[in-house]
Amino acid sequence: ETAPKVEEATKKLFPEGIPSMGADALRFTMASYASLGRSVNFDFKRAEGYRNFCNKLWNATNFVLMNTEDKDCGQDEMQPLAFTFADQWIIGKLQQAEAAVAEAFETYRFDLAAQTLYEFVWNEYCDWYIELAKVQIQTGCPTTQRTTRRTLVRVLETILRLLHPIMPFITEELWQVVAPLANAKTADSIMLAAYPQADKEKIVQTAFDKMAALKDLVEEVRKLRGEMGIAPNVKAPLFVEGSAELEGLLKYLPSLTRLTEAKLVDNLPEAEDAPVAVCNGARLMLKVEIDKAAETARLSKEA
């Protein structure tokens, strides 16, 4: 009885037809709705967001391939490896994601599995680890570069296997290229490969602590830039007064926060007009020459 009314309303709502989102994006959307009951108010914006997620995964894979194909990816176990805290952090987060996804599938909470995978891939692997890996590949020694490439491809290959039950098409396509680089081509198809299982022994708490400290530093530097009104295209030097333990974190800041350099000093330089931020006991200062007259005029205008 309601079918004609639904058809008429749908035609009015989508006069040009329903836009194509792709099978994987549709499957991921339906998985995210799994716990909402029998009635689902389908949100096309949500499906569009998961289509963007597919694009994000594709672009991340392209980056990994550009930096690993025909290069030493650390699959020769006889070669030395040097895992940084960033490598250990993403490997540890992967174990947590694997455990959470396994529990979600066991309890038929496909929505939680989808949410866990989305957050890990987008927020942790793409937004954080890939950016840190760029620094390690550009500035690290050959052993660090080898280890970074190994981590990039092995984590990505595991991501593809984790995602496969929900997004079978894009993961199959990408896995055929990524798996050989990770020395993980154990079957002709990803659907025949073993599903990932968490190994809690690979979770290193000190790496988590260092990553949390780095995130705090990045947040404070970005706040400083905002407070000082520094344009996104302007780079400035950062001076940090703090413990020697910060030295290993500072090399990541220039690329993450658009700095010319990040330097650890015994005492901050004298600059009466430069604001100072405090982060976990460290004092941070961006050294930027400020036009005092222009700044005074701006503040007066805002007041």
Sequence positions of predicted segments:
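Feature 926 captures the class I aminoacyl-tRNA synthetase adenylation module centered on the KMSKS loop
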Residues: 1-23, 48-303
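Extended amphipathic secondary-structure runs
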Residues: 17-36
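Short, solvent-exposed helix-loop connector elements
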Residues: 38-46
